[in-house]
């Protein structure tokens, strides 16, 4: 549990596009009194911290520093965005061997100075690297969280909201499983303000059929690739997703977010990190919710878990 104190310290490991934008989003949100940036590129990290600090007059009081692992000591949350960037045409799972080696150098240093912190993994492939972090850190599963499918779920809500011309915040649904190509959309539990999506579409004379579901799902699944093809990287939306998770932890909100957590017995899935609806609060993941899926969704989720397990088993350096 995050202890009540007058200051809140968040460290961000990795000051690339995702890390720096996450620090910016955290700064705007006002959730932290201190933000520490750490990266192998010292000059860039110093520049990012300076640039952010120059906006201090426009936000709630916050001290932004660049430093090394020692400077992260006693963080409430350590956000890990470091790793090789996903290239055009490269899947998240193809990044694994590069980033496992990076994490083997990062995690021991983070743990050395942050015995009580919650670790929030953002680097891709996030589910695999969350599991790697869990194993390397020795922390309880509740305190090792992946950003999971929080962003994918937002993308799904956006797609449905855009097509139905409604506020995406009124769409209740989840993307589950891998944050990547084997993720699943939980159409069977999707609703618009507690009205099942098929009933809502029928009542409002809107499209809802196999073609609709396929198009929406493909747009969500391929969203990152489309952004990367156009601008080289994704970082704004994931920074907002990370900030949402951080706020849930620091505020002990006990809100439900589809973060990546260790699954221990769900449709026979065990010992793998997956994006799952979880109650997120001051202790991190306080409970993973076992929502009822239909047979097709459950089968796809099992396959998603198998994909991640096979990737872990075939990865070098573990």
From Swiss-Prot:
Catalytic activity: (S)-lactate + NAD(+) = pyruvate + NADH + H(+)
Cited Pfam families: Ldh_1_C, Ldh_1_N
Binding site for NAD(+): 18, 39, 44, 69, 83-84, 105, 122-124, 147
Chain positions found as Phosphotyrosine: 225
Transmembrane domains' residue ranges: none
Subcellular compartments: Cytoplasm
PROSITE patterns recorded: L_LDH
Sites where the protein binds substrate: 86, 92, 124-127, 152-155, 234
Keywords, alphabetical: Cytoplasm, NAD, Oxidoreductase, Phosphoprotein
The enzyme's E.C. designation: 1.1.1.27
Pathway annotation: Fermentation; pyruvate fermentation to lactate; (S)-lactate from pyruvate: step 1/1
MF terms in GO: L-lactate dehydrogenase activity
BP terms from Gene Ontology: glycolytic process; lactate metabolic process
InterPro entries: L-lactate/malate_DH (IPR001557), L-lactate_DH (IPR011304), L-lactate_DH_AS (IPR018177), Lactate/malate_DH_C (IPR022383), Lactate/malate_DH_N (IPR001236), Lactate_DH/Glyco_Ohase_4_C (IPR015955), NAD(P)-bd_dom_sf (IPR036291)
Main localization category: cytoplasm
Top-level division of the source organism's lineage: Bacteria
Residues at the catalytic site: 179 (proton acceptor)
GO (cellular component) term, any one: cytoplasm
NCBIfam families per UniProt: L-LDH-NAD, PRK00066.1, PRK06223.1
Record's function text: Catalyzes the conversion of lactate to pyruvate.
Family: Belongs to the LDH/MDH superfamily. LDH family.
Subunit structure, as described in the record: Homotetramer.
Protein name: L-lactate dehydrogenase
């Amino acid at each position: 549990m995050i202890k009540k104190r007058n200051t809140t310290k968040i460290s961000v490991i990795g000051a690339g596009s995702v890390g720096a934008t996450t620090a910016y989003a955290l700064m705007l949100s006002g959730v932290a009194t201190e933000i520490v940036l750490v990266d192998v590129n010292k000059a860039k990290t110093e520049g990012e911290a300076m640039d952010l600090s120059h906006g201090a007059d426009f936000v709630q009081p916050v001290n932004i520093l660049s430093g090394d692992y020692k400077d992260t000591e006693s963080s409430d949350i350590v956000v890990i965005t470091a790793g090789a960037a996903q290239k055009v045409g490269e899947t998240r799972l193809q990044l694994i061997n590069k980033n496992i080696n990076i994490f083997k150098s990062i995690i021991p240093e983070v743990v050395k100075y942050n015995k009580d912190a919650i670790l929030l993994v953002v680097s891709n492939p996030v589910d695999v690297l969350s599991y790697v972090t869990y194993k390397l850190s020795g922390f309880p599963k509740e305190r090792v969280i992946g950003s999971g499918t929080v962003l994918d779920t937002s993308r799904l809500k956006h797609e449905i909201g855009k097509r139905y011309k409604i506020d995406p915040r009124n769409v209740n649904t989840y993307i589950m499983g891998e944050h990547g190509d084997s993720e699943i959309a939980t159409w069977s539990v999707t609703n618009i303000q507690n009205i099942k999506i098929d009933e809502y579409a029928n009542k409002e004379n809107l499209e809802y059929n196999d073609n609709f579901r396929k198009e929406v799902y493909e747009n969500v699944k391929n969203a990152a690739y489309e952004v990367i093809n156009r601008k080289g990287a994704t970082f704004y939306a994931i920074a907002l997703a990370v900030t949402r998770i951080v706020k849930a932890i620091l505020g002990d909100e006990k809100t439900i977010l589809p973060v990546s957590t260790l699954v221990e017995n769900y449709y026979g899935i065990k010992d793998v990190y997956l994006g799952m609806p979880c109650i997120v609060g001051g202790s991190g993941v306080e409970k993973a919710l076992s929502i009822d899926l239909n047979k097709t969704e459950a089968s796809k989720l099992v396959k998603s878990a198998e994909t991640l397990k096979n990737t872990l088993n075939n990865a070098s350096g573990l």
